[in-house]
Amino acid sequence: SLLELGKMILQETGKIAITSYGSYGCNCGWGHRGRPKDA
């Protein structure tokens, strides 16, 4: 589940998944605006 994934990310990286990676990816940022990262 997403909850378990978030717990795993926190345990392995020490980062909170939604705040650290929420704007990462092809649809970056709120409202799917912004430039893609690592593209």
UniProtKB/Swiss-Prot annotation:
The keyword Secreted applies. It catalyses: a 1,2-diacyl-sn-glycero-3-phosphocholine + H2O = a 1-acyl-sn-glycero-3-phosphocholine + a fatty acid + H(+). It is found in: Secreted. Binds 1 Ca(2+) ion. InterPro entries: PLipase_A2_dom, PLipase_A2_dom_sf. Transmembrane segments: none annotated. It holds the Pfam family Phospholip_A2_1. GO terms for biological process: arachidonate secretion; lipid catabolic process; phospholipid metabolic process. Its EC number is 3.1.1.4. Inhibited by ethylenediamine tetraacetic acid, ethyleneglycol (beta-aminoethyl) N,N,N',N'-tetraacetic acid, p-bromophenacyl bromide or N-bromosuccinimide, but not by iodoacetic acid or diisopropyl fluorophosphate. It comes from the Eukaryota. Keywords: Calcium, Hemostasis impairing toxin, Hydrolase, Lipid degradation, Lipid metabolism, Platelet aggregation inhibiting toxin, Secreted, Toxin. Its cofactor is Ca(2+). Expressed by the venom gland. Snake venom phospholipase A2 (PLA2) that inhibits ADP-induced platelet aggregation. PLA2 catalyzes the calcium-dependent hydrolysis of the 2-acyl groups in 3-sn-phosphoglycerides. This is Basic phospholipase A2 2.
